[in-house]
Amino acid sequence: MSTPARRRLMRDFKRLQEDPPTGVSGAPTDNNIMIWNAVIFGPHDTPFEDGTFKLTIEFTEEYPNKPPTVRFVSKVFHPNVYADGGICLDILQNRWSPTYDVSAILTSIQSLLSDPNPNSPANSTAAQLYKENRREYEKRVKACVEQSFID
Amino acid sequence: MESVGNNDANRDELIIQQQREIEKEISDSTPLVSGQLPLTCLREEYNGDEIFTEKIRELSKKYKFIRRTRPDGNCFFRAFAYSYLEYLITNNTAYQEFKILAEASKDKLVQLGFPSFTLEDFHETFMDVIKRVNPTNSEENEKVKNELHTVFNEQGYSDYVVVYLRLITSGKLQEDADFYQNFIEGDFSIEEFRHQEVEPMYKESDHIHIIALCTALGVGVRVEYLDRGEGDQVKAHDFPEGSEPKVYLIYRPGHYDILYPN
């Protein structure tokens, strides 16, 4: 059955194919349009460069009125990424707008990689290193970039 | 410190899950928009409360019926849309004018910087709803009103109407940012306010939302405030000030419902 959420997800997918933003990609899983797989490539000139980070996006029938649940599957060492891959990002929580689509979600997460917000940490070690020991932070990030090739 | 250790657990998702359970409880027990009920039904809610009982008695001299909306944070927008469309069903000229304004609103929002791709989706549905309540002739009015009631209780349509009105409100705040900035408390910028308090669904409306929406659509709204304030009269406020109301709402702290004047 076509519901507003499913209809909208078909549109999101079409747009992502026709007008793909640089450095991100995503598609519904084979048998369920409510669950997507996505990849974000680490932005240039950041310690995440060259990484290929996999994510899952889970939508409910309330999309786009409510945000989907987005989670990194690849291990990501980042101040705003929880140990289980969950992401602490305002537009996925209290600043969600129904005008955001999958493309906007992925590009926002991509810029979060470049610009962490250490003041609302999901990973306190990463936040602390980011603020106090940038060299060690970058080393830990690069380790997860290498890991992302194997995953 | 313990709090640092707990930090790494994914609290956001737990909070969201809990919120969703509460919302589900509300949505299972109340329709998005109820049928017309006698205003006196409010009395039961305030049984034994003198101030409210007196105010309800005063209010019932002016209004006969109330129509409840689901208390989900979208009540102002849903009540406004329902009530205004219900008025338009009885006024073909105003209906035709509103249809033109609604049709043109999309381009305006795109000009203001809203993403046209996602906007289109909401606008199409909004126009669908407007077309479904086209007043054909006065004999058919009741039928069209039933259609309105059906549409507004279909979550998909009903919520998209709310989203679109939120976007119109947000657009108006942006367009006249210098003016609306005065209404915002604290250090919020208009930009932050729009993204945090206007565009997200389920965020409650304040005066500033009402003024911006009414001004953008050129629709007068009268709100009757039923609260513990002084006196035995319910205070009314018209938005925008001095306008002739087409939509009548009752506000009780945290919630809007629709009123029907005598």
Curated annotation (Swiss-Prot), chain A:
Disruption phenotype: Lethality during the second instar-early third instar larval stages. Mutants show defective synaptic function as a consequence of mitochondrial failure. Its EC number is 2.3.2.23. Pathway: Protein modification; protein ubiquitination. It is found in: Nucleus. It comes from the Eukaryota. Pfam families: UQ_con. GO terms for molecular function: ATP binding; p53 binding; protein domain specific binding; ubiquitin conjugating enzyme activity; ubiquitin-protein transferase activity. One of its GO terms (biological process) is endocytic recycling. The keyword Ribonucleoprotein does not apply. Belongs to the ubiquitin-conjugating enzyme family. This is Ubiquitin-conjugating enzyme E2-17 kDa. It comes from Drosophila melanogaster. The lineage of its organism: Eukaryota, Metazoa, Ecdysozoa, Arthropoda, Hexapoda.
